[in-house]
Structure formats: structure tokens, C-alpha cells
């Protein structure tokens, strides 16, 4: 209450944990806050940090070393991989698991792996469920939808809907998902040859 009665005071709340992402905090602060979404560094910001011009080497560094600001301080690939593993465990396993009350996060991990392996492809929720089920991992369309919503809400992926120019409306299926930071895929898929055309 002390801050409430003081004039000229700004309070900043930062974070990305399950409580902040759940919307409960936003409900408590309704009408009294401005949300500023912070993303990992864009390629331009990455170049500005290193004071370099865009070239193939810098782009490959960007997609291999991570665009999270903390990763810029890390020297060794193993340190970056440890950091990405920690991010994965914090964001996907703990935050999403807690927020959605997922006791067994194995299937969430499977969906995340599928998404990181299909960055930029046109996907439907049914196609994802069918593909995972055909691989011996039975999962419902509803569960896939819930997990995808959680991954998007947690800023792991950005969803891009298809737009019908003639009909001037968004199509209901065939969305594309792009990773907010493509290096997070290394925590799930390991460091193997990546198709840079899809990221």
C-alpha cells in the first residue's frame, strides 16, 4: 500500500515463470500495467552487439550460438548447450508443466521435438496427432492443441496463420510455427545438420 499512495513511482515486474505467464497476474493488475514483451535478440541486434556486418559466418553463429543475451557471454559450445538445456527444463518442463498441470511431461517433450523438427512447415493439429500416433505415441487432437497453445504462450514458438487473399480471411488450418530462438532445438534434437531454409 505504501507504493500505491506515493506519487511518481513506477514498479517493474519481470520474469517468465508459470505464474506470470498464467494470466493470473495480469488479472490482478488489470488496467494498471503495460506489458512489454521481450524476445531474444534479432539478427540485427546480434550484429549490433558484435559490431559486425551481416555475412554468412555471422548468420551461422547466430543460429548456432543462440540469440538469448546471456549466451553471448558464453565461450564454449558445451556451455551454450548446458544453458539451452537449462532453458528447456525451465520453460517447457517446469513452467508449462506447472501452468497446465501436466504430471508427465514426456508427451509435451515429444510434441516440442516434433515442432522443432518441423519449423516452417505447414501443419495442422490433426496431422501432428496422427503422425505421433502412427509413430506409436497415442495422443489426442485436444492434447496436441493444448500443448501447442502452451508453447506459443510461453514464446517458445510463434504461430503464423495462413491468409486467403481472395477471401480476405485467415484459414483455420495449415499454420506454420517458427522457433523464437532456433537453438532451443538443440536441447531436444541435439546438434546435427540443420536445414537453414526452414528456420
Where are each of the predicted segments found?
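Interdomain motor-coupling "hinge/lid" segment immediately C-terminal to the ATP-binding subdomain
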Residues: 16-18, 22-122
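Short connector loops at helix/strand junctions that flank enzyme active sites
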Residues: 6, 30-33, 172
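Hydrophobic/aromatic beta-strand patches that form the interior of the parallel beta-sheet core
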Residues: 12, 34-36, 178
